[in-house]
Design a protein with these regions (language model features):
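Subtilisin-like serine protease catalytic core
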Residues: 1-124
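Acidic side chains
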Residues: 86, 103, 136-137, 181
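Sec-exported extracytoplasmic/periplasmic mature domains
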Residues: 92-96, 132-140, 162-166, 176
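Structural motif
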Residues: 103, 134, 187-190
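Loop/turn elements at helix/coil->beta-strand transitions in domains of secreted/extracellular proteins
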Residues: 107-112, 136-142, 165-171
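Substrate-binding/specificity loop regions of serine endopeptidase catalytic domains
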Residues: 123-127, 146-191
Length: 191
C-alpha cells in the first residue's frame, strides 16, 4: 500500500541506503530483522522458559546451596560477553589502528575477568561468590554494572559486599538501566 511505499522511500533516502533500490533496501532490512530475531531468540526460549535450567550442565552446582563456593567454568567470553568487554574498555582500553582513544585508567588498571552474570542470568549466589573470589584474588575495585528488581538471596550479596569493604575494596555499583527512581523502586544490589 502507499504507507509501505512511503516507508521504503524514506529508507532509501538514509545515507547508508543512497543509491540502492527499494528491493535492495528491503533485502537489507530482512537481514537485520533475521539478525535481531536470532539475537533475542535465547531470551524467548531460555530466559522466559521457567523449565529451562542450564546450571546443572554448565555450572555444575546446586543453586539453592549457598555454602558451595567452588563451581563454574573458565568460559568468561560466552555467547554475549560484550557488556563486560565494553566496560573494561572504558576503564583500561588502549587505542587500536587509527583510533586514539584510551580508557580512563589505562596506565594503572589491570583487569580481572570474573563473569558472574552470564547472558543476564543474575543469581545472588553467583554474585556473592564472584565478589569474594575477586577480593581474595587481589582486586582493589569491583565494577558491578548489573542489577535487578528482585533479590531473593540479597543477604548473601550484602555479606559479600561487607567482606569486600573490610578488605578495603571499592565497589562501583550500577543504579540501573531502566530509568527508575531507586529511591522509590528497589534495585539490587544498589539499595
Amino acid at each position: 500500500d502507499s504507507r509501505n511505499l512511503q516507508i521504503l522511500n524514506s529508507l532509501v533516502q538514509d545515507a547508508e541506503n543512497v543509491g540502492k533500490t527499494p528491493k535492495e533496501v528491503e533485502e537489507l532490512l530482512k537481514k537485520e530483522v533475521e539478525g535481531a530475531l536470532k539475537h533475542y531468540e535465547s531470551q524467548a526460549t531460555k530466559h522466559y522458559n521457567l523449565d529451562f535450567d542450564p546450571r546443572k550442565e554448565i555450572v555444575g552446582d546446586n543453586y539453592d546451596n549457598y555454602n558451595e563456593k567452588h563451581y563454574g567454568n573458565n568460559h568468561y567470553e560466552g555467547p554475549d560477553a560484550s557488556h563486560g568487554t565494553h566496560v573494561s574498555g572504558i576503564i583500561a582500553g588502549l587505542p587500536h589502528g587509527n583510533e586514539a582513544q584510551y580508557g580512563v585508567a589505562h596506565k594503572v588498571a589491570k583487569i580481572m575477568t570474573v563473569r558472574a552474570v552470564p547472558d543476564g542470568d543474575e543469581r545472588d549466589k553467583d554474585v556473592a561468590n564472584a565478589i569474594r573470589y575477586a577480593v581474595d584474588n587481589g582486586a582493589k575495585i569491583l565494577n558491578m554494572s548489573f542489577g535487578k528488581a528482585v533479590s531473593p538471596g540479597k543477604k548473601h550479596v550484602w555479606d559479600a559486599m561487607k567482606y569486600a569493604e573490610k578488605k578495603g575494596v571499592l565497589l562501583v555499583k550500577a543504579a540501573g538501566n531502566d530509568n527508575q527512581n531507586i529511591g522509590e523502586n528497589e534495585y539490587f544490589p544498589t539499595n
